[in-house]
Amino acid sequence: MSSIDKTMKFNFSEEPFDQDIKEILMTVHESLQEKGYNPINQIVGYLLSGDPAYIPRYNDARNLIRKVERDEVIEELVKFYLEQNRETK
C-alpha cells in the first residue's frame, strides 16, 4: 500500500487557546457587523483563502484574527459544532 492510500493522522497540541479564539472570533464578528459586512461570509472567506483582506482593520480585527492559525480556528469551530449537536441526535 503506497503512502497515498494511507490515512494520515492530524494531531493538534492541547493548547489553552479555546477562550482566546472565541474572544477573537466574537470581536471580529462584531467589527464586521459594525462595518456592514456579512460576518459569516467574510470569516469563511478568510478561513478558506487566508487572505486577511476579508477582515477589516476596524477595531484591530485583522491583526487579532492573524494571531491564531486558521487551522486552530477551524478546529475550534468543528469542536463547538459537534459538541452542540451531539445532544440533538
From Swiss-Prot:
UniProt xrefs under HAMAP family: UPF0297
Similarity section: Belongs to the UPF0297 family.
Domain of life: Bacteria
Organism, scientific name: Oceanobacillus iheyensis (strain DSM 14371 / CIP 107618 / JCM 11309 / KCTC 3954 / HTE831)
Alphabetical list of NCBIfam families matching this protein: PRK05473.1
UniProt protein name: UPF0297 protein OB2008
Classification via InterPro entries: IreB
